[in-house]
Curated annotation (Swiss-Prot):
An individual GO BP term: cellular response to oxidative stress
PTM annotation (3-hydroxytryptophan): residues: 199
Chain positions carrying an annotated carbohydrate: 285
Residue ranges the record assigns to the propeptide: 22-28
Binding of heme b, residues: 204
Organism: Phanerodontia chrysosporium (White-rot fungus)
The protein, known as: Ligninase LG2
Protein residues bound to Ca(2+) 1: 76, 94, 96, 98
Gene name tied to this protein: GLG2
SUPFAM superfamilies according to UniProt: Heme-dependent peroxidases
Length: 371
């Protein structure tokens, strides 16, 4: 379904839910564990939740397993092309789990390198609980985000049928693609515009890279990879000065902090006139970050699906955790200041931020998957 149609469907659904709640008591079902949901079919997902929190996310941590589960959502969902369909070619099924069903094919695609590990990690849970791969990928991604302090309250809908064929290669954006290429790709996938593209990249707030630089693993995109905040949007605007590893890798540019990786697409989107002001708008604005990402994540997980035929099981997703402490949502790390910013938005100045005290340090790597 095209994004604008999807937007209308989601908006109507949310409006009807609010209206119904104001008139009559919402119809609920009570599960065996005593928790209530809007639809009885959602009860089975509590067993899945308990299992993956204990045995995949190690007690609800926002670590490597969570980061890779979030990445898997995007790589599965974005693989859809109405433009190819219009030419009589199969354009992929979007959020249909094809990357897991046809993993030997799709994880070999260049932008999906490294995802074979998270697919292998998730497959046993799919088989154990008898859910579809598409539903599980969306569920695991939503739960993973709920484990990261500061993330939105995530939504989750079921009803994705198993993919019947693999998505074509070439539909997942690469770190070395131009801004024009990436905007065109997301516009084809769901009629997303350049602003909504920036919303998608909020996921890099809780992410790391294992395969851009072959000499080093677990390189985060910002200094707070375990927290869903706007530091990613601050630190990508620092003037690039160094590489965290070997350097000179395809799709990598110099970052502004030791131990932190910066991919070419993030660097150029932060500075392109079409996206720079939206990029900067998240700095110091946690509520905008949360609202926009909550919407775009749901939209992505419903690409290729009919939202009206899906079941809302958002009740199963844990409450998101608040950002710990009383510190600012955006800040300059120790040793950094406004003079390190490469101002790109021509409409408004870069926000005034505090610099945290202490000496400048290297950003720690993300530990690999736990056995």
């Amino acid at each position: 379904m095209a994004f604008k149609q999807l937007f209308a469907a989601i908006t109507v659904a949310l409006s009807l839910t609010a209206a119904n709640a104001a008139v009559v008591k919402e119809k609920r079902a009570t599960c065996a564990n005593g928790k209530t949901v809007g639809d009885a079919s959602c009860c089975a997902w509590f067993d899945v939740l308990d299992d993956i929190q204990a045995n995949m996310f190690h007690g609800g941590q926002c670590g490597a397993e969570a980061h890779e589960s979030i990445r898997l959502v995007f790589h599965d969902s974005i693989a859809i092309s109405p433009a190819m369909e219009a030419k009589g070619k199969f354009g992929g099924g979007g959020a249909d789990g094809s990357i897991m069903i046809f993993d030997t094919i799709e994880t070999a695609f260049h932008p999906n390198i490294g995802l074979d590990e998270v697919v292998a990690m998730q497959k046993p849970f799919v088989q154990k609980h008898g859910v579809t791969p598409g539903d599980f990928i969306a569920f695991a991604g939503a739960v993973a985000l709920s484990n990261c302090p500061g993330a939105p309250q995530m939504n989750f809908f079921t009803g994705r049928k198993p993919a019947t064929q693999p998505a074509p290669d070439g539909l997942v954006p690469e770190p070395f693609h131009t801004v024009d290429q990436i905007i065109a790709r997301v516009n084809d996938a769901g009629e997303f515009d350049e602003l909504e593209l920036v919303w998608m990249l909020s996921a890099h707030s809780v992410a790391a890279v294992n395969d851009v630089d072959p000499t080093v693993q677990g390189l985060p995109f910002d200094s707070t990879p375990g927290i869903f905040d706007s530091q990613f949007f601050v630190e990508t605007q620092f003037r690039g000065t160094l590489f965290p590893g070997s350097g000179g890798n395809q799709g990598e540019v110099e970052s502004g902090m030791a131990g932190e990786i910066r991919i070419q697409t993030d660097h150029t989107l932060a500075r392109d006139s079409r996206t720079a002001c939206e990029w900067q708008s998240f700095v110091g604005n946690q509520s905008k970050l949360v609202d926009d990402f909550q919407f775009i994540f749901l939209a992505l997980t419903q690409l290729g699906q009919d939202p009206n035929a899906m079941t809302d099981c958002s009740d199963v997703i844990p409450l998101s955790k608040p950002i710990p402490g009383n510190g600012p949502f955006s800040f300059f790390p120790p040793g950094k200041s406004h003079s390190d910013i490469e101002q790109a938005c021509a409409e408004t100045p870069f926000p005034s931020l505090v610099t945290l005290p202490g000496p400048a340090t290297s950003v720690a790597r993300i530990p690999p998957h736990k056995a």
